[in-house]
A protein has these predicted regions:
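Dynamic "connector" segments at or just before major functional cores
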Residues: 1-209
Length: 209
């Protein structure tokens, strides 16, 4: 590589070292474990009706981690999947809360060839579709802001978020809370999206912090 003031050198790592470029995410995994995020989700969100496939906790936590990692779309979940070090950490977290028998079964599952550490983009798209109510779309009026009524799964997610806030309040009680709200433009390439006042296609979710 071209040299400047400092003599930089680099070389490719030839062996499988298990390093990660997402070193900040394990801190959030630890926080989620301490606050019982998985328990909050499991108590209220019931999209998954069988024991097969990814659980509600795994799907939602993967989406949370994708957001924290700066993903722009569901397809960016591939970034997490390709990071071997992160996948090893996530696998460790998955087995921590289980019994020995469950842990051994999970470890055998993780050792299977081509096993994913996070749901595939198609699996996440199918999961997210459960939170969408097509009947509500019929009441949408062109050119007007519209907030669809939440279906049972969105209501469950709201309850899980309520419990999560309660866990934080329990550990750090506050008498007052300031809610900062703002409508933010999120650029999208979806063909059904409308153009924003900035001149590009976007959705405008109403965020509250």
């Amino acid at each position: 590589m071209a040299q400047g003031v400092l003599p930089y050198k680099y070389e490719g790592e030839r062996n499988d070292a298990g390093m990660t470029a997402l070193a900040g995410l394990p801190i959030y995994l630890d926080l989620a474990s301490v606050l019982g995020v998985a328990d909050c989700i499991g108590a209220h969100v019931h999209v998954r009706k069988s024991d097969q496939g990814w659980t509600d906790e795994q799907a939602i936590l993967s989406l949370m981690l994708l957001n924290l990692a700066g993903g722009d779309c569901v397809d960016d979940i591939k970034i997490l999947e390709k990071d071997e070090g992160f996948c090893r950490v996530l696998g460790r977290v998955e087995t921590k809360r289980q019994t020995r028998q469950q842990r051994r079964a999970m470890e055998r599952w993780w050792r299977k060839e081509h096993h994913r550490c996070v749901p595939s983009p198609s699996a996440l798209f199918r999961y997210l579709k459960a939170f969408h109510d097509p009947e509500e779309e019929r009441t949408r009026e062109p050119g007007r802001a519209f907030i669809p009524a939440p279906n049972e799964h969105l209501q469950g997610l709201r309850k899980a978020n309520r419990d999560f806030v309660g866990c934080i309040q329990k550990r750090h009680p506050e008498q007052e809370a300031t809610l900062d709200n703002d409508a933010t433009l999120v650029e999208t390439q979806k063909k059904e999206a409308l153009f924003s006042y900035e001149g590009y296609k976007a959705y405008q979710p109403f965020n509250i912090w």
